[in-house]
């Protein structure tokens, strides 16, 4: 599903996209990822919750891969796009290990580990990435 959005937004001639075109493509990736995440069913058990966390990990990694595959604008707009994607990748590289810890804690029903993993997730500061998304024209990826 996310891959289809990538092909719809990024193929064509050899010209670099404009800032607005990059922003629209990035926003589509973010919207598709949000849609995938909201489609995950509310878990009814710890085992269901662990499976849901795996789906979150997969969707998150997939959206990052799709963002990284987008063509960037030239010049300052391209630099802004690169900074946004690098910041997003940094956040995700912090988040996935915390999600894996949460999944493992859910599987083992370790309440203390769950609380610790949730705290790690909440501690990830998205302020810079949100500002960089807006600067890159990807306002839909902010917040």
Which stretches of residues belong to each language-model region?
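C-terminal motif of bacterial Sec signal peptides marking the signal peptidase cleavage site
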Residues: 7-10
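Bacterial signal peptide processing site
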Residues: 12-14
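Sec-dependent N-terminal signal peptides
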Residues: 1-3
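Alpha-helical segments in soluble extracytoplasmic regions
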Residues: 21-108, 112-141
């Amino acid at each position: 599903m996310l891959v289809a959005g990538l092909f719809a937004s990024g193929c064509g001639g050899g010209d670099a996209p404009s800032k607005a075109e990059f922003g629209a493509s990035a926003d589509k990736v973010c919207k598709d990822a949000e849609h995938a995440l909201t489609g995950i069913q509310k878990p009814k058990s710890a085992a269901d919750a662990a499976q849901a966390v795996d789906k979150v990990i997969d969707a998150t990694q997939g959206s990052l891969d799709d963002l990284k595959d987008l063509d960037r604008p030239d010049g300052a707009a391209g630099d802004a796009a690169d900074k946004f994607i690098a910041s997003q990748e940094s956040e995700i590289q912090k988040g996935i290990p915390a999600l894996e810890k949460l999944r493992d804690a859910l599987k083992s029903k370790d309440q203390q580990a769950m609380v610790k993993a949730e705290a790690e997730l909440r501690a990830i500061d998205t302020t810079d990435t949100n500002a960089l998304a807006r600067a890159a024209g990807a306002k839909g990826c902010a917040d």
